[in-house]
Amino acid sequence: MNYLKLTFDKLEVGEINDLVAHESCGAISLFVGTTRDNFDGKTVVLLEYEAYEAMALKTMNQICEELRARWPDIKHIGIHHRLGTVPVKEASVVIAVSSPHRKSSLEAVHFAIDELKKSVPVWKKEQYAEGEGCSEWKENKECSWSKSHRDNHIL
């Protein structure tokens, strides 16, 4: 089963872990992406996320389909992404995958976060400490529609 969620609520690692747990699985691999307190020498106080929600959920589901095609022994997949304000140290994304053995779940989580960054329409704005330029919408250089990606890849 796939457990996909976009939410303005704080993400709970235990919740997604419980959702993907299964008695036939000996492995649950997790990725937790958090807000760090700095970027390019600026002090970050929080991130703000927006999404094209319907398309984001559709794309997240496509990522799950790709994971299942590559690692057929995967049992459950959870992808939760936070929207709105995310303070420093809090999770903005949690990905969890269960499988009978660790290799599949570890590889699948790694693939999932890379694909999420490349293809899911979620945007972030960094809020900086006072006197450091207030805030800035960030281009995700990994996403397929970004100028940086187009400049460095032949389409």
Curated annotation (Swiss-Prot):
Output the SUPFAM superfamilies linked to this UniProt entry: Molybdopterin synthase subunit MoaE
Q: Which GO terms describe its cellular component?
A: molybdopterin synthase complex
Q: What is its EC number?
A: 2.8.1.12
- Functional pathway: Cofactor biosynthesis; molybdopterin biosynthesis
Localization:
Cytoplasm
List the keywords (alphabetical): Cytoplasm, Molybdenum cofactor biosynthesis, Transferase
| Main location (coarse class) | cytoplasm
Instruction: Please state the span of the N-terminal signal peptide per the UniProt entry.
Output: none
- Reactions it catalyzes: 2 [molybdopterin-synthase sulfur-carrier protein]-C-terminal-Gly-aminoethanethioate + cyclic pyranopterin phosphate + H2O = molybdopterin + 2 [molybdopterin-synthase sulfur-carrier protein]-C-terminal Gly-Gly + 2 H(+)
Known CDD domains for this protein?
MoaE
* Top-level enzyme category: transferase
The record's comment on protein family reads: Belongs to the MoaE family. MOCS2B subfamily.
Q: How does it assemble?
A: Heterotetramer; composed of 2 small (MOCS2A) and 2 large (MOCS2B) subunits.
User: What role is this protein assigned?
Assistant: Catalytic subunit of the molybdopterin synthase complex, a complex that catalyzes the conversion of precursor Z into molybdopterin. Acts by mediating the incorporation of 2 sulfur atoms from thiocarboxylated MOCS2A into precursor Z to generate a dithiolene group.
Q: What else is known?
A: This protein is produced by a bicistronic gene which also produces the large subunit (MOCS2A).
Name the UniProt record assigns to this protein: Molybdopterin synthase catalytic subunit 2
This protein's species is Aedes aegypti
